[in-house]
Amino acid sequence: NGGTSGLFAFPRV
């Protein structure tokens, strides 16, 4: 999603 999710503390694309 290009940002950080609540369950994932790393940037997602």
From Swiss-Prot:
Alphabetical UniProt keywords: Amidation, Neuropeptide, Secreted
Transmembrane segments: none
Predominant place of localization: secreted
Ranges in a coiled coil: none
UniProt GO cellular component terms: extracellular region
Gene Ontology biological process terms from the UniProt entry: neuropeptide signaling pathway
Xref: InterPro entries: Periviscerokinin (IPR013231)
Keyword Secreted found: yes
Keyword flag Nucleus: no
Subcellular location: Secreted
Tissue: Dorsal ganglionic sheath of fused ventral nerve cord.
Chain positions with Valine amide modification: 13
Similarity remark: Belongs to the periviscerokinin family.
Function statement: Mediates visceral muscle contractile activity (myotropic activity).
This protein's name: Periviscerokinin-1
Organism annotation: Sarcophaga bullata
